[in-house]
Swiss-Prot record:
Lipid biosynthesis listed as a keyword: yes
Protein name: Acyl-[acyl-carrier-protein]--UDP-N-acetylglucosamine O-acyltransferase
Pathway membership: Glycolipid biosynthesis; lipid IV(A) biosynthesis; lipid IV(A) from (3R)-3-hydroxytetradecanoyl-[acyl-carrier-protein] and UDP-N-acetyl-alpha-D-glucosamine: step 1/6
GO MF term list: acyl-[acyl-carrier-protein]-UDP-N-acetylglucosamine O-acyltransferase activity
Any one cellular-component term (Gene Ontology): membrane
Region (Disordered): 256-279
Sequence similarity: Belongs to the transferase hexapeptide repeat family. LpxA subfamily.
The protein's Enzyme Commission number: 2.3.1.129
Recorded coiled-coil stretches: none
Example GO biological process: lipid A biosynthetic process
HAMAP family on file: LpxA
Gene source species: Chlamydia caviae (strain ATCC VR-813 / DSM 19441 / 03DC25 / GPIC) (Chlamydophila caviae)
UniProt xrefs under InterPro entries: Acetyltransf_C, Acetyltransf_C_sf, Hexapep, Hexapep_transf_CS, Lipid_A_LpxA, Trimer_LpxA-like_sf
Primary role: Involved in the biosynthesis of lipid A, a phosphorylated glycolipid that anchors the lipopolysaccharide to the outer membrane of the cell.
Amino acid sequence: MTNIHPTAIIEPGAKIGKNVVIEPYVVIKSTVTLCDDVVVKSYAYIDGHTTIGKGTTIWPSAMIGNKPQDLKYQGEKTYVTIGENCEIREFAIITSSTFEGTTVSIGNNCLIMPWAHVAHNCTIGNYVILSNHAQLAGHVVVEDYAIIGGMVGVHQFVRIGAHAMVGALSGIRRDVPPYTIGTGNPYQLGGINKVGLQRRQVPFETRLALIKVFKKVYRSEDSFSESLLEAQEEYGHIPEVQNFIHFCQNPSKRGIERGADKDALQDESVEKEGALVES
């Protein structure tokens, strides 16, 4: 049963699904759609052509779908789509897109922590975590299972690859390859996100191959492109490696991140069932 507090302001035309909870002093504008089982907590503000997926919770004072912070915007009809079972926490801001017909898209099962900012024309995959005060500029792409640490700033048009983990306080100016971990400003890749991949039950052999490919690409005396081709020949039959190589060979206009922590590259081992296995 839908439960709407009498102090909530819901404009005519807004579409409200079944079993929706709308708490005190919420504002829902006329072009918003709330799917079934959505919870909108006090003082949240939802504007624009915004669709909130089933089971998602919008926490107090979050702002979604308002005018993009882009001087190029001239009132075009643009969209925000948030998937199912997401948590949009307190004071998070998700603006609408800039160009006619474009969408800011957030996938399913994402956690957007307090004060995080998702700017115009961003695309976020499934199971993504944006930590407190993470700031995404316009046109950023964050792929599935990526984790962005607290107070990270991501430059416009950058891509963050799947399963990547970006450490807190980092400044991201170039594309971050999938499956990697890193930190710093300027950003330094620290290797493969071994713990995250293990937690997601990626097979040991795949994790080991990714570690070897990373070292081949980032430590080789050959050029970056040549190292990728060598990795393709040796490990390209593994889907995750293929994804890593394709990502690096097809960067955004920002280019691929090539800075790597020298100390991390000296670590030649990976855990398997408690034992240390040389790579």
